[in-house]
């Protein structure tokens, strides 16, 4: 009996440190930014909503300040909502905050070959350097011909099949990037490259949305528990290889046949420093960044114009005064279209493409605003909270393009703009969107064309003959900020505008020809 008691005592003494260690898991360490109270083991995981994470982060920012912390099990999450904190953490300390968090899902699906989700490594730096050479502000001038031509087809598609306006925007965004990247375009919204990409992207976005799947990177043992996400990953691995690998193979076969059109992959296939894995990683990053963001913006842009006819009329009057009625607008006109520029910026402010952006990850401990940012912390830029802050914006939930006519940031007089960036919609630091200039050109061209060619109105209910209302607050917001389905009418402004849209599309066929040779 005495021997048993001795063993029990020894066992208890050995277990005490283990129990104390387990109880410390999930607790907020000293020196971290403040945040909501935690529970042992889980930290703040139990407080995460199934949807609307950006709203919860914004509510916590109001309570705990412009930088706060969360505990996801043993892991630390830092959320920066104030521009000052974002600038210091993401821009000024970019040498140690440019990594991406470990992503089991991404690794299983891509084998590590995705520049957008790649760790801060030589692989990422090589891919970023090659993509940057294709997408500098100067290099993007060379892509304008394709962007204009594809935008001409977009207007024609709106003209002849307006009810499919969402699909037309997806076709445009997809075809522009595949033409420049892989030398092949999509002439119709049902073209295989379009349908395959957006179906795959829908599943990919859902899988990566925080809260939509088990946090296997924060709680590793969860990856061994059966779940539907494993079947989704296996399916997506095949789909991504078929899509991106197929694009690379198709380009290589054209080159072998002596057919070239100057696309990006043609040069890189002959670059001995670029292997297939890096090519695939660049294809996925450019496709996912270029196709999704532009098509989502177009949906929000159309919704805002339908809901605010007075804004549409004012923007149209400005375009008419600068462009006239005998030609389509062009990118050079943007310097003389301050109100149109303000409309574009206000769409991006009110409904940023991503509410939280892709998370960063710290590789070294840092100190920001007197708080410790530990090594291996996941870092979110709360773009939604930043762009909807009532201390910075008058009526932040209202669509008011005029705010950008009096401030480059759209902020109200007296607002603290320290650290604020005009390019926050594209991310920050060394991970800022490599296609930013290309994307800005696409948004400008398509926005000008739409306002110039069409009057966007509410659809008419065939039963009541009354306008069908739209609601600018009806959005599905997960990883991306996407309007829920809505109806509208595209009314071409005149027979002359119709003729010019048709002529522009006819002339664009010469531009399309080299990209329709598969």
Curated annotation (Swiss-Prot):
Belongs to the cytochrome P450 family. Pathway: Secondary metabolite biosynthesis. Its main location: membrane. Signal peptide: none annotated. This is Cytochrome P450 monooxygenase ARMGADRAFT_1018417. Armillaria species are both devastating forest pathogens and some of the largest and oldest terrestrial organisms on Earth. They forage for hosts and achieve immense colony sizes via rhizomorphs, root-like multicellular structures of clonal dispersal. One genetic Armillaria gallica individual localized in Michigan's Upper Peninsula stands out as exceptionally large, covering hundreds of tree root systems over approximately 75 hectares of the forest floor. Based on observed growth rates of the fungus, the minimum age of this large individual can be estimated as 2500 years. Its cofactor is heme. It is found in: Membrane. Keywords: Glycoprotein, Heme, Iron, Membrane, Metal-binding, Monooxygenase, Oxidoreductase, Transmembrane, Transmembrane helix. Glycans are attached at residue 455. The keyword Lyase does not apply. InterPro entries: Cyt_P450 (IPR001128), Cyt_P450_CS (IPR017972), Cyt_P450_E_grp-I (IPR002401), Cyt_P450_sf (IPR036396), Cytochrome_P450_fung (IPR050364). The chain crosses the membrane at residues 3-23. It comes from the Eukaryota. GO terms for cellular component: membrane. Melleolide sesquiterpene aryl esters are cytotoxic secondary products with anti-cancer potential. Armillaridin shows therapeutic and radiosensitizing effects on human esophageal cancer cells. Armillaridin induces autophagy-associated cell death in human chronic myelogenous leukemia as well as of hepatocellular carcinoma cells. Armillaridin can also inhibit the differentiation and activation of human macrophages and thus might have potential to be developed as a biological response modifier for inflammatory diseases.
């Amino acid at each position: 009996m005495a021997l048993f008691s001795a063993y029990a005592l020894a066992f208890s003494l050995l277990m005490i440190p283990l129990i104390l260690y387990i109880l410390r898991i999930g607790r907020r360490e000293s020196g971290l930014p403040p945040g909501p109270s935690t529970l042992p083991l889980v930290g703040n995981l139990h407080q995460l909503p199934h949807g609307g994470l950006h709203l919860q982060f914004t509510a916590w920012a109001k309570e705990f300040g412009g930088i706060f912390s969360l505990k996801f099990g043993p892991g630390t999450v830092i959320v920066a909502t104030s521009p000052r904190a974002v600038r210091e953490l993401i821009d000024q300390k970019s040498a140690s905050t440019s990594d991406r968090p470990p992503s089991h899902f991404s690794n299983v699906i891509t084998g590590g070959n995705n520049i957008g989700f790649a760790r801060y490594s030589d692989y990422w730096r090589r891919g970023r350097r090659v993509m940057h050479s294709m997408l500098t502000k100067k290099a993007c001038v060379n892509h304008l011909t394709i962007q204009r031509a594809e935008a001409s087809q977009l207007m024609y598609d709106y003209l002849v099949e307006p009810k499919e306006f969402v699909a037309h925007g997806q076709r445009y965004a997809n075809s522009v990037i595949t033409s420049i990247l892989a030398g092949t375009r999509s002439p119709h919204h049902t073209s295989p490259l379009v349908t395959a990409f957006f179906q795959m992207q829908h599943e990919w976005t859902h899988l990566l949305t925080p809260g939509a799947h088990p946090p296997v990177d924060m709680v590793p043992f969860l990856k061994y528990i059966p779940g539907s996400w494993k079947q989704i990953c296996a399916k997506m691995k095949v789909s991504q290889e078929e899509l991106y690998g197929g694009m690379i193979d198709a380009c290589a076969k054209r080159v072998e046949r002596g057919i070239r059109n100057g696309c990006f992959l043609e040069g890189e296939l002959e670059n001995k420093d670029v292997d297939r894995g890096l090519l695939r990683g660049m294809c996925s990053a450019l496709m996912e960044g270029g196709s999704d963001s532009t098509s989502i913006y177009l949906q929000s842009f159309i919704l805002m114009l339908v809901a605010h006819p007075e804004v549409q009329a004012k923007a149209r009057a400005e375009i008419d005064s600068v462009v006239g009625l005998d030609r389509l607008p062009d990118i050079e006109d943007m310097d003389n279209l301050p109100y149109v520029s303000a409309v574009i910026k206000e769409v991006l402010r009110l409904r940023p493409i991503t509410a939280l952006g892709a998370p960063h990850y710290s590789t070294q401990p840092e100190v920001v605003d007197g708080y410790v940012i530990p090594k291996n912390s996941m870092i979110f830029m709360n773009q939604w909270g930043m762009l909807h802050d009532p201390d910075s914006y008058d009526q932040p939930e209202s669509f008011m393009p005029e705010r950008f006519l009096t401030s480059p940031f759209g902020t109200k007089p007296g607002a603290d703009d320290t650290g604020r960036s005009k390019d926050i919609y594209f991310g920050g630091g060394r991970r800022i969107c490599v296609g930013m200039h290309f994307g800005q050109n696409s948004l400008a061209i398509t926005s000008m064309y739409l306002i110039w060619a069409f009057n966007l109105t509410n659809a008419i209910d065939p039963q009541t003959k009354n306008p069908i209302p739209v609601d600018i607050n009806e959005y599905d917001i997960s990883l991306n900020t996407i309007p829920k389905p809505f109806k509208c009418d595209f009314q071409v402004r005149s027979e002359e505008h119709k003729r010019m849209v048709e002529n522009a599309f006819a002339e664009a066929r010469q531009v399309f020809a080299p990209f329709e040779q598969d």
